[in-house]
């Protein structure tokens, strides 16, 4: 499915801008992950763009996980995917209080003789924005991510303090009243990325885009953390290079 065709349907559905959606779509088109996992789908807008890119690739499947509360949203992921005619590209899973329980069950299902066989090429963590939940989610997802795969975090610079200023004391099931002042003030995802992901010996190609998205690849490579903008031109250039090299 072409990007513009997907965008006509998905524009206006929270929570992804068209610019970010283009970067995500082009990443899927260029890297061609087959088995994708999304932790946190809200209304399914980003899920729709991933599914559209997988459909354009001619192969692949997305598993999207969120909380049971997402059934009550005014626009559900099921409605979003149905409007794209891409429901068959996505398996929707819901857990009561955390996608980490889903990850536990996946690790269990993939384990034989005490060894977990990884099963995903791309993991997109876009949920709680909380050190305790997403810090654990990284280590659990790592067990399921194949060598050479990519992991992406949304909300790199998001803070509970900013949400509180907007009058929101609870975010993704976490109450700010249960957090210490320094955890409220510090971007939790940034802490996860720099203290857990960027220090992990199996990861490289660290990139922070627009202080919003944070990428890493499970492969040997440069340890430097680069800060860039979400360049649509750059993603298109990568796609063109892949075509020229015969990998598109």
Residue map of PLM features:
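N-terminal, positively charged/glycine-rich alpha-helical extensions of SAM-dependent methyltransferases
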Residues: 1-5
């Amino acid at each position: 499915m072409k990007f513009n065709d997907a965008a006509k349907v998905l524009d206006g559905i929270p929570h992804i801008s068209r610019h970010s959606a283009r970067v995500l779509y082009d990443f899927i088109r260029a890297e061609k992950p087959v088995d994708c996992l999304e932790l946190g789908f809200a209304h399914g807008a980003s899920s729709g763009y991933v599914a559209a890119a997988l459909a354009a690739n001619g192969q692949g499947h997305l598993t999207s996980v969120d909380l049971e509360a997402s059934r009550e949203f005014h626009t559900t992921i099921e409605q979003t995917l149905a409007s794209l005619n891409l429901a068959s590209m996505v398996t929707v899973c819901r857990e009561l209080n955390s996608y980490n329980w889903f990850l536990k069950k996946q690790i269990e299902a993939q384990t034989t003789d005490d060894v977990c066989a990884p099963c995903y090429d791309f993991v997109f963590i876009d949920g709680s924005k909380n050190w305790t939940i997403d810090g654990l989610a990284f280590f659990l997802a790592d067990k399921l991510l194949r060598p050479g795969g990519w992991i992406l975090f949304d909300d790199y610079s998001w803070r509970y303090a900013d949400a509180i200023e907007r009058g929101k004391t609870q975010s993704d099931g976490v109450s700010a009243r249960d957090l210490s002042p320094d955890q409220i003030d510090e971007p939790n995802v940034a802490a996860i990325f720099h203290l857990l992901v960027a220090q992990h010996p199996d990861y490289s190609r660290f990139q922070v885009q627009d202080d919003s998205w944070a990428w890493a690849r499970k492969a040997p490579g440069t340890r430097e953390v680069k800060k860039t903008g979400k360049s649509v031109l750059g993603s298109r250039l990568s796609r063109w290079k892949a075509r020229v090299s015969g990998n598109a």
